């Protein structure tokens, strides 16, 4: 009797879609006083009813997934029923199973998933096993290694890639600033800046544009379109097709902007070990500053950073191997400018891998005074046996031709090295043809055991060598313009070292030499570490300019920055709201030393970030001691920023807003500013649910929002925080996996149950209770399918959730026995917080 009572309690709370229970055997004749008629065979055998269960997937001893799986009943060779998982083709492909090598995998099984997908019969794969542990909620799969593909690093299988939904997209960022100078006279200025990134997704096609607008006091506003292009991925050949404005790749030739068409390999579609790197821009901001990064005069990135060292690691991958022009627009009105020289790594591809690019179009310089000219470029790289890589290309235009040839070698544990040369024939405007050549050698190595990364490069050019841009830029508005400052030699070296608990250190340096005998040396070093929550960093850089062009005051510049961050939890207790104290010392050649202290933290559920700083500059003749306040509010519809600073002579105020929008077939959704690839969260009826741990990212009043920070061609997990759900709402699974293609808007749809919770007593028309174990389902709308809800206990009661105030239930037991019941909830809930009601099943 004790056992029977315990079973009744368990089944009272039993829900087919979300269940945690123990397995017991019992005699069905002891229940319902013999009135049964219900098939309890599975329960008698210690099994469970068919349905959808959340499980952890264990493949060959490793946990690889967690998801809802549909289980159906099947008999084993002893005639006993058991639950068998429905593993669809997409699921198995996602786990790396070679489904194409087993044509009968889905032919011998007539079962289908709830979405009509075929269920696999794993017995087709020799020695494959499956074992469902209901109590542990684990599905243990054993599949021979011969039936599984080698794991791909950093990429999902191609069959899982999702082009997303069609939509109109828009990212925006608007900023305004007011600056006042108070001395003998009062001066002021206002500056406004806006960035719009509209786009359209149609299937696998992407239309993208970047337009900026600038306006300063006394000047009219100026619009600038950085690019507009149409592109799509060609998954079967791991390539990308582009029409419009873009950049040629920089693997072999220097990159140039063009308007036309391009077809080339897309490294986002291949594993990490076959990819090349994207540049990283590092620097030091004295105040809160806006960082602008330009390539060939075009703005490609704009970002607000806090005072101290910064690193931009998410630059748009345009393939430009030339210098990046970086502008640091300080909040006190000063501007830092510097170039970031970065070189592509040594070329060494895996055997059999082909990387190519074909470009045809028109040269597209940012300077309108430069005349247009057609251009064409073809490059190819191929991995040969014996760890060799052959590569070459041709670059042509109206006044230029370049031919390249090179060879790379993988040295195994000693890194990789490549050597290439380019022969050029170019005619600058007003001058005769010049013929020259350049050669370069590149070496890269990462020592995983010691955490050391090393890269070095050397390039040397003859007097007659010119790049395509050097030649075409001389054709300006009908006048001759000769380029004299071409670089003839460059040496670079980069070293980084991980020191374990002692932090990390990095060193970079190099020299550029030009035809006018000007030389530029640069060297930088950094060290960072964390100890008991205290983070500190030291950054130093030195630029040395050699040549008659520079005055003595501009020959050498040193920049030293010391920064420290101390969490205040130790002094403020557990409820510290993430308050952190910061300190900074910065010394730049020719300027007074800056000392800064500050406090920052978060409030209102991480949505508000605040930052208070005090800057002291001893000895400054301008009395530059400054107080600053920075605020940023991160909400579900975007972000708001504000800054106020003042000292004796100046006052500055900045305000800004940014966000994103998507118009799709289901309506319109807003969110914080996103990347090019994004996810549309769809959790109908659940408003205000936090998403992914990002501050302020939450669903709107309909249960929708936009999320960036998703990687194309990779598996991304989108998570909802159940602690932020409104009352009377449930989600069967709080995480979803999405694998978007580049630029896609993929939908992460969560199955929600919104409504009241009730304990319903079901009886027949004659007053007798429905049999124990009766499965009760809920009809959402007229004509809509019934949804699994719960199981009746021995007293005719069933727990249901997601109920409206009135509706219809379907009860089913035995082989063909069923009835329908109309219910209506009472006005008040019971003591337990759920409704108690009765319904007659007819």
UniProtKB/Swiss-Prot annotation:
One CC-aspect GO term: cell outer membrane
Organism annotation: Escherichia coli
Disulphides: 819-841
Keyword S-adenosyl-L-methionine recorded: no
Molecular function terms from GO: fimbrial usher porin activity
GO terms under biological process: pilus assembly
Record protein name field: Outer membrane usher protein AggC
Membrane topology: Multi-pass membrane protein
Record bears the keyword Disulfide bond: yes
Compartments where found: Cell outer membrane
InterPro entries to which the protein is assigned, alphabetical: Fimb_usher, Fimbrial_membr_usher_CS, FimD_plug_dom, PapC-like_C, PapC-like_C_sf, PapC_N, PapC_N_sf
Lineage of origin: Bacteria, Pseudomonadati, Pseudomonadota, Gammaproteobacteria, Enterobacterales
SUPFAM superfamilies from the UniProt entry: FimD N-terminal domain-like (SSF141729)
UniProt keywords, alphabetically: Cell outer membrane, Disulfide bond, Fimbrium biogenesis, Membrane, Plasmid, Signal, Transmembrane, Transmembrane beta strand, Transport
């Amino acid at each position: 009797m004790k056992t029977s009572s315990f079973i009744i309690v368990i089944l009272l709370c039993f829900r087919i879609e979300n269940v945690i229970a123990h397995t017991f055997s019992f005699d069905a004749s002891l229940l319902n006083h013999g009135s049964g008629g219900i098939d309890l065979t599975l329960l008698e055998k210690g099994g469970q009813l068919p349905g959808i269960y959340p499980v952890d997937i264990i493949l060959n001893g490793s946990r690889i997934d967690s998801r809802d799986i549909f289980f159906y009943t099947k008999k084993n060779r002893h005639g006993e029923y058991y639950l068998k998982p429905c593993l669809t083709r997409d699921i198995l492909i996602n786990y790396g199973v070679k489904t194409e090598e087993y044509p009968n995998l889905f032919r011998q099984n007539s079962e289908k998933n709830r979405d009509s997908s075929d269920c696999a019969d794993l017995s087709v794969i020799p020695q494959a096993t499956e074992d469902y542990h209901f109590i542990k909620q684990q599905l243990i799969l054993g599949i021979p290694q011969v039936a599984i593909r080698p794991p791909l690093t950093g990429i999902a299988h191609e069959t899982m890639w999702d082009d997303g939904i069609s939509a109109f997209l828009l990212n925006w960022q608007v900023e305004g600033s007011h600056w006042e100078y108070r001395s003998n006279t009062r001066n002021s200025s206002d500056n406004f800046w806006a960035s719009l990134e509209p786009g359209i997704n149609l299937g696998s096609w992407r239309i993208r544009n970047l337009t900026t607008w600038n306006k300063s006091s006394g000047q009219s506003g100026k619009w600038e379109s950085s690019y507009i292009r149409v592109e799509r991925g060609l998954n079967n050949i791991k390539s990308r097709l582009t029409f419009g404005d873009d950049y040629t790749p920089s693997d072999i030739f220097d990159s140039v902007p063009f308007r036309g068409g391009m077809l080339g390999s897309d490294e986002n579609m291949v594993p990490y070990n076959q990819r090349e790197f994207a540049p990283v821009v590092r620097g030091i901001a004295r105040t809160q500053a806006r960082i602008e990064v330009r390539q060939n005069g075009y703005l490609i990135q704009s970002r607000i950073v806090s005072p101290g060292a910064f690193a931009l690691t998410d630059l748009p991958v345009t393939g430009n191997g030339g210098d990046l022009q970086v502008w640091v627009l300080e909040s006190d009105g000063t501007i830092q400018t510097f170039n970031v020289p970065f070189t592509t790594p040594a070329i060494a591809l895996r055997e059999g891998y082909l990387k190519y690019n074909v470009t045809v179009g028109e040269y597209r310089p940012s300077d309108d005074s430069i005349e247009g000219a057609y251009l064409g470029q073809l490059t190819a790289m191929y991995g040969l046996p014996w760890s060799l890589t052959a590569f070459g290309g041709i670059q042509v235009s109206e006044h230029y031709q370049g031919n390249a040839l090179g060879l790379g070698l993988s040295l195994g544990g000693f890194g990789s090295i490549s050597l290439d040369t380019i022969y050029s024939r170019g005619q600058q405007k007003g001058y005769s043809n010049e013929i020259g050549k350049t050669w370069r050698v590149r070496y890269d190595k990462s020592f995983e055991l010691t955490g050391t990364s090393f890269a070095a490069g050397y390039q040397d050019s003859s007097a007659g060598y010119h790049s395509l841009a050097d030649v075409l830029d001389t054709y300006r508005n009908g006048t001759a313009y000769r380029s004299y400052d071409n670089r003839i030699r460059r040496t670079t070296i980069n070293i980084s070292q991980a020191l374990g608990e002692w932090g990390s250190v990095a060193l970079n340096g190099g020299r550029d030499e030009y035809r006018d005998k000007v030389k530029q040396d640069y060297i930088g070093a950094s060290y960072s570490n964390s100890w008991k929550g205290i983070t500190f960093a030291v950054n130093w850089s030195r630029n040395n300019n050699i040549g008659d062009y520079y005055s003595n005051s501009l020959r050498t510049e040193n920049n030293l920055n010391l920064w420290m961050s101390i969490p205040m939890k130790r002094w403020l207790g557990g409820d510290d709201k993430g308050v952190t104290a910061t300190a900074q010392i910065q010394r730049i050649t020719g300027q007074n030393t800056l000392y800064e202290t500050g406090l920052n933290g978060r409030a209102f559920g991480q949505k508000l970030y605040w930052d208070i700083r005090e800057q002291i500059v001893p000895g400054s003749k301008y009395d530059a001691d400054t107080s600053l306040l920075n605020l940023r509010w991160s909400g579900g519809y975007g972000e708001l920023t504000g800054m106020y600073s003042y000292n004796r002579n100046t006052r500055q105020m900045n305000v800004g807003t940014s966000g994103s929008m998507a118009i799709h077939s289901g309506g319109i959704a807003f969110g914080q500013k996103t990347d090019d690839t994004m996810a549309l969260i769809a959790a109908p009826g659940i408003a205000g649910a936090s998403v992914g741990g990002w501050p302020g990212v939450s669903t709107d009043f309909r249960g929708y929002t936009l999320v960036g920070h998703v990687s194309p061609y990779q598996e991304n997990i989108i998570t909802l925080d159940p602690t932020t759900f409104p009352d009377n709402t449930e989600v069967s699974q709080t995480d979803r996996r999405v694998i978007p293609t580049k630029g896609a808007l993929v939908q992460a749809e969560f199955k929600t149950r919104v409504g009241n919770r009730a304990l319903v007593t079901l009886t027949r028309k004659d007053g007798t209770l429905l049999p124990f174990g009766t499965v009760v389902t809920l009809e959402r709308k007229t004509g809509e399918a019934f949804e699994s809800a719960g199981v009746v206990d021995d007293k005719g009661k069933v727990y249901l959730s997601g109920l409206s105030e009135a509706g219809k239930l379907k009860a089913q037991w035995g082989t063909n026995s069923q009835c329908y019941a109309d219910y209506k909830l009472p006005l008040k809930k019971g003591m337990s917080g759920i409704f108690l009601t009765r319904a007659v099943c007819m």
